[in-house]
Amino acid sequence: MSDHSEAIATFQSITGASKEESTFYLESHDWDLEKAAQTFTTLQEEENQRNDQPQIEEDYEDEEEEDDHRDPMPASRPVYSKPVAKTVSKKAPAGGRVGGIRTLSDFNNDDHDDHDHSDGDDDEDDRSQQYFTGGEKSGLVVESAPKKGKNGGSGDIVNDVFDSAKRHGAVASNEKKVEKPDSFDSVGYQLGATDQGNRNVSKPKEKDPNSQVVEVKVTFWNQGFTIDDGPLRKYDNPENKELLDDIQRGIVPRELQKKATTPNGLSVTLINNHNQDYVEPAKPKYVAFSGGGQTLGSSSTSTNNNNNNNNNNNNRATTTSTTTTSTPNVSSINVDQSQPTTTVQIRLANGSRLSTTFNHSHTLQDVINYINSSSGSNQSFDLLTGFPQKPVTNPTSTTLKDAGLLNALLIQKLK
């Protein structure tokens, strides 16, 4: 023992243990000072942790009671039992959280915990909240109405559907902005008496149809629910049970999955309006077409169609800002019916359209005089042919036949 007195003294100075304890640990480790000190420190830390725990399993307490009734060991060598692994019952994390992974249910339970510590529970019930749930390519958006308390009827059914959807992982979500489609999606030409002449209207950039997400809206009413603008469907109808059960489980119903026509999947919005009665939207009334029409082209028409053309001009709308609702009072042209005739259509600068009959021998000056008389203006102008537009450069004394303007369309362009 005298040979190990220095090791015992060193162990006591390091650990603060008694001489008997120091001797026991050193002998247990073949007088290896480092290993003995490490074992002593580890056991002391575990012992302190056990003392700090408020609850210990009953089987461990029973062992301690049994140890009290056992005969003590000889005082010459104290016995230090191996520490029992501490077993403390802990409350399982809500939502099945495993290995530090937070699931959708964990977020949902966190919401409930926050509400338990808040003073405004009644205010929370009066707010309209929006939730979403679902997978990578599809999901549900749940927009709940203010709760009015369960009083039976459809309110209980709808509340059960929404509460169940939230329990299956619904979390708060912002409302999506629905992009409105462009009203024009083609290529065209703007025709008319404009300073730019004919103008090409380019086609806007096309949107990739595969990048769009198909959206379906399910609205819950007092009497039942509707899908988009479809008819009212009753809650107690057995045909609707599968759809409601899928929503309660937090998944997109199979019936709605058929609407997913793009790779980006389906977005289903649930709106809780069970406090409101469903009102069927008014059906649009059918209105028969009552406007006028015009045959395009330069085909020859007889003089008997002049009255019909004038009536059509009264009902025809144009794109210019100076549209007129009726044809001006035109001056008559002396037409020799025994001579060849032609019909010339004239589009005035103010948007009005004229259609009159000339002889082949009438000159361009006759046409100019007719336009001035019809428009009531002597402002100088140029005459352009139809499409493609180009100015008429012939002398005013040239006949319509020689100028190649038989059955032509002329456009007035002010200078």
Swiss-Prot record:
The keyword Cytoplasm applies. It is found in: Nucleus; Golgi apparatus, Golgi stack; Cytoplasm, Cytoskeleton, Microtubule organizing center, Centrosome. InterPro entries: C6orf106_UBA-like (IPR039517), NSFL1C_SEP_dom_sf (IPR036241), SEP_domain (IPR012989), UBA-like_sf (IPR009060), Ubiquitin-like_domsf (IPR029071), UBX_dom (IPR001012). Residues 213-279 form the SEP domain. The keyword Cytoplasm applies. Residues 298-334 have a biased composition (Low complexity). It comes from the Eukaryota. GO terms for biological process: autophagosome assembly; Golgi organization; membrane fusion; nuclear membrane reassembly; proteasome-mediated ubiquitin-dependent protein catabolic process. Belongs to the NSFL1C family. Reduces the ATPase activity of VCP. Necessary for the fragmentation of Golgi stacks during mitosis and for VCP-mediated reassembly of Golgi stacks after mitosis. May play a role in VCP-mediated formation of transitional endoplasmic reticulum (tER). Reduces the ATPase activity of VCP. Necessary for the fragmentation of Golgi stacks during mitosis and for VCP-mediated reassembly of Golgi stacks after mitosis. May play a role in VCP-mediated formation of transitional endoplasmic reticulum (tER). Regulates the centrosomal levels of kinase aurK/Aurora during mitotic progression by promoting aurK removal from centrosomes in prophase. Also, regulates spindle orientation during mitosis. PANTHER family: NSFL1 COFACTOR P47, UBX DOMAIN CONTAINING PROTEIN. This is NSFL1 cofactor p47 homolog. It comes from Dictyostelium discoideum.
